[in-house]
Amino acid sequence: MQIKRWFLNNSLRNYQYLLYDKSHAIVIDPLKSDIFAEFIAKNKLQLEAILITHKHGDHIAGVKKLLAIYPNAKVYAYTGNDLFKPDIYVKDGSFINLGFTSFRVMYIPGHIDDHVCFLFEQERALFCGDTLFNAGVGGVQAESADINQLYDSLVKITKLDGDIKPYPAHDYWLGNLDFALSILADDSYFNYYRNQVAELAAEDKPIVNLAEEAKLNIFIRAMSDKALLKALPDYSLGREMFVKLRQLKNNF
């Protein structure tokens, strides 16, 4: 299947994603229903599934309107919410075969306690919501957030094949790289990508695979990068370094 990406240019800098082939469509975390409905109608597709990574409003606001247009579409989510009840409740390890494609579910709490991601192995795509961003990770402001769970979820993602491409729900490239450079100012990867994305519109920013993400993401590098021991000598690599970096990012 092909993957269509839109940038909403709203205050939260949301990306929206749709998978499609000649006949079928799958929507991920719809905030704005109209862009999906227009594309689906224009290409004469059938909306088969709506996948929800978590229940924050900017990931579910468009679900009811899409279901009004496509009542046969099935909603997949870890838990329900005030706007809708899922047709299929997923959990860690769930495998869903839709016939025209399939996906696996990973439970990745930390940003919020109902967070999952959807791994499309044939497409080599991971829809990771607000857990992993380009050059960053999700925040821990939600009531059910847990910074240690977020670390464990990130470790879980890094164990996937390096050629899989993560598709995060927001464009936070610049802010995340600026933070990373405040810790490791001379790092070649941080500087390279900061210079590259600075001139690009959000719609044109790169979609990198997990192997590349591991080089440009300071939170992944917190697991093993000894350069961080010089920058933050009071903290050990792994969970302790990750927690410290997430705390510093909160106030950046």
Curated annotation (Swiss-Prot):
Pfam families: HAGH_C, Lactamase_B. This is Hydroxyacylglutathione hydrolase. Binds 2 Zn(2+) ions per subunit. Thiolesterase that catalyzes the hydrolysis of S-D-lactoyl-glutathione to form glutathione and D-lactic acid. Belongs to the metallo-beta-lactamase superfamily. Glyoxalase II family. GO terms for biological process: methylglyoxal catabolic process to D-lactate via S-lactoyl-glutathione. It comes from Francisella tularensis subsp. holarctica (strain LVS). It comes from the Bacteria. Its EC number is 3.1.2.6. Zn(2+) 2 binds at residues 58-59, 130, 170. Keywords: Hydrolase, Metal-binding, Zinc. CDD domains: hydroxyacylglutathione_hydrolase_MBL-fold. One of its GO terms (molecular function) is hydroxyacylglutathione hydrolase activity. PANTHER family: HYDROXYACYLGLUTATHIONE HYDROLASE (PTHR43705), HYDROXYACYLGLUTATHIONE HYDROLASE GLOB (PTHR43705:SF1). Pathway: Secondary metabolite metabolism; methylglyoxal degradation; (R)-lactate from methylglyoxal: step 2/2. Monomer. It catalyses: an S-(2-hydroxyacyl)glutathione + H2O = a 2-hydroxy carboxylate + glutathione + H(+). Its cofactor is Zn(2+). Zn(2+) 1 binds at residues 54, 56, 111, 130.
